[in-house]
Design a protein with these regions (language model features):
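N-terminal glycine-rich flavin-associated loop
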Residues: 88-111, 137, 151
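Hydrophobic, small-residue-rich alpha-helical packing segments that form membrane-like cores
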Residues: 136-139, 155
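Short Ser/Thr-interspersed hydrophobic loop/turn segments at strand-loop and sheet-helix junctions
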Residues: 54, 79-84, 177, 193-197, ...
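Alpha-helical interface subdomain recognition
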Residues: 1-85, 107-110, 119, 123, ...
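Flexible, small-/acidic-enriched active-site or ligand-binding loops
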Residues: 142, 196-225
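Long, acidic (Asp/Glu-rich), low-complexity accessory segments flanking structured domains
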Residues: 220-239
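A structural signal for short hydrophobic beta-strand segments in well-ordered beta-sheet cores
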Residues: 145-148
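A short core secondary-structure module
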Residues: 154, 158-201
């Protein structure tokens, strides 16, 4: 199913359809001309272009010049779906602007919002979300970085963060550290830290199979005003989970965009490639692969936009729905893209061919913002928790 067909679903209103149509036209006219060779420059160029085009307004609330009253998850998902179909780095640039500011939008003071959101909205500043550590990725409660009091109005952050998207080019980081109010998850707090703060350094740039700016950060006595805290003391886990609750569905949307493009490339290839004197598409095994991919694309779209719609209707949390969307869409996209590579034959593993690029792009999505295995645990726990609640009600 194409995006146009998806937009006919009742999940969307006319505002979503206008946004999608405008972004798609802009992307088709703009993205191909942006630089690709220098990774940092390419990412900066995409942030600037998205800001100038007005599309980063989707990651900022209306009170600070944004597009919607709050963070409209359907709009965020549509943007990632559309951008991923065309250019993985553009999807990344959009997504990280949102992930690196959502915590500020949701939990920041009026002063923090006024300071950090407008530059991101306009593409003048680059945002980042610094959660993962060498020994704490999906297990957020195991974070070891500390933020200790330094006088009455400051804290000092010490520790290491790794796998930080936009690391090395960001203007600010949303950083999570242990402040010690309680053991485990309840002892974390979140802060906005400017990239040029003394003691904050990039200790390593990390190269991955689908290149994007990624780094390990070192915090050595990084002095941060207490006013830069997001939420209250000990609210860090809540801040992280609320942010991921919004953006986890959008990871599924990016996977959906990659899968849509792979299916498009597969259909075009199967129709035009001659094999044994006839189009590849006439072989039943080819038709079976196309049918499986098309079904998985549609199922992914339903899960992604169901989760986004549910959140936008006012649900406090969509933990189960977002986990299902991310888990299914990323795993399905891997299968869809793998079939596309196979049906392209030798071209499928040739650098510069679109399906080869997609094969590298999709792999990380099954890991970041909660690996597939973690999503399975989350889904099961949500179901078991709900069952326990119903059992208690039945016993009364």
């Amino acid at each position: 199913m194409s995006l146009d067909e998806t937009l006919s679903w009742p999940f969307f209103d006319d505002g979503h359809r206008r946004f999608a149509e405008t972004l798609a036209r802009w992307a088709d006219a703009t993205l191909a001309a942006l630089p690709h060779d220098d990774l940092d420059a390419a990412c900066r160029a995409r942030v600037k272009a998205l800001g100038e085009g007005g599309f980063l307004k989707a990651v900022v609330p209306a009170e600070h010049g944004g597009l919607n009253r709050g963070l409209d998850v359907r709009t965020l998902c549509l943007a990632r779906d559309i951008l991923a179909f065309r250019d993985g780095l553009s999807d990344f640039a959009f997504a990280m602007q949102g992930l690196g500011t959502a915590s500020i939008s949701l939990f920041g003071s009026a002063a923090l919002k006024a300071r950090y959101l407008p530059p991101v909205r306009d593409g003048r500043a680059i945002a980042a979300f610094a959660l993962s550590e060498p020994e704490a990725g999906s297990d957020v409660a195991a974070l070891a970085a500390t933020a200790k009091p330094d006088g009455s109005a400051h804290l000092r952050i010490d520790g290491t963060k790794t796998w930080i998207s936009n690391g090395g080019i960001a203007d600010h980081y949303v950083v999570f550290a242990r402040t010690g109010e309680a053991a485990g998850a309840r002892g974390l707090s979140a802060f906005v830290v400017d990239a040029d703060t003394p003691g904050l350094s990039v200790s390593e740039r990390i190269a991955v199979i689908a290149p994007h700016p990624l780094a390990k950060l070192r915090f050595e006595g990084v002095r941060v005003p207490l006013a830069n805290r997001l939420g209250g003391p000990g609210d860090g886990f809540k801040v992280a989970m609320a942010t991921l609750d919004v953006f986890r569905s959008t990871v599924g949307a990016a996977a959906l965009g990659f899968a849509r493009r792979a299916l498009h490339e597969t259909v075009e290839r199967a129709a035009s490639r001659k094999l044994f004197g006839a189009p590849l598409a006439e072989l039943q095994l080819t038709q079976g692969a196309i049918a499986e991919s098309a079904s998985e694309v549609d199922a992914s779209a339903l899960l992604v936009y169901r989760a986004a719609w549910t959140k936008d209707q006012g649900a406090a949390r969509v933990t189960r729905e977002a986990a299902m969307a991310k888990m299914f869409a990323t795993e399905a996209a891997q299968r869809v893209i793998d079939r596309a590579v196979q049906l392209h034959g030798g071209l499928g593993i040739t650098k510069g061919v679109k399906v080869e690029e997609l094969y590298r792009e999709i792999r990380a999505l099954r890991i970041y913002e909660g690996a597939t295995e973690v999503q399975k645990v989350v889904i099961a726990r949500e179901l078991l928790k709900n069952r326990s609640g119903k059992s208690a009600l039945a016993a009364e």
